[in-house]
């Protein structure tokens, strides 16, 4: 993605790579676990949600606020879809049982609702990324319903680090 100058170029690169090479690779630590990817891609002027299913994908331009959380959100409101797809992308590709067990819709709703609150963008991002589904969640007790998941317990695939920043014309992450 470092070769892209805009969010639109990044979307075009990712979709080109997906169509050429597909998606593969076990993302489970000690078990076989595969899933398709979603991307929230932004530059200083525009943002996109890109959701994938194998070599298929749907792209939706973000008009205001968007969140992703391991569940499909693009229905028939996409700006572009691969292979002349016509229909409801989420209804076609989402595994409802996996999505429910993973708490994906609940996490997505939580992060979106927090971002809609009236506060500074940095405070809202920090609040969203550190939010738990219950006051009972601690470092020793995790939940797939929480945006912030602590490693350990019966779950071994949590993301324990988050990052956010203000997008300017010059932006570096190392």
Question: Where is each model-derived feature located?
Answer:
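Well-ordered mid-protein domain cores that form the structural environment of catalytic cofactors
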Residues: 1-20
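C-terminus-biased signal that marks the final domain/tail of proteins
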Residues: 11, 15, 26-30, 34-37, ...
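Phosphate-interacting basic helix/loop segments used at nucleotide- and nucleic-acid interfaces
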Residues: 21-25
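Short polybasic amphipathic segments
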Residues: 39-41, 58-59
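Structured loops at beta-to-helix junctions and adjacent beta-edge loops in soluble globular domains
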Residues: 42-44, 52-53, 62, 166-168
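Structured soluble/peripheral alpha/beta segments that form catalytic or ligand/cofactor-binding pockets
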Residues: 46-59, 159
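Active-site and NAD+-binding cores of ADP-ribose-processing enzymes
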Residues: 59-65
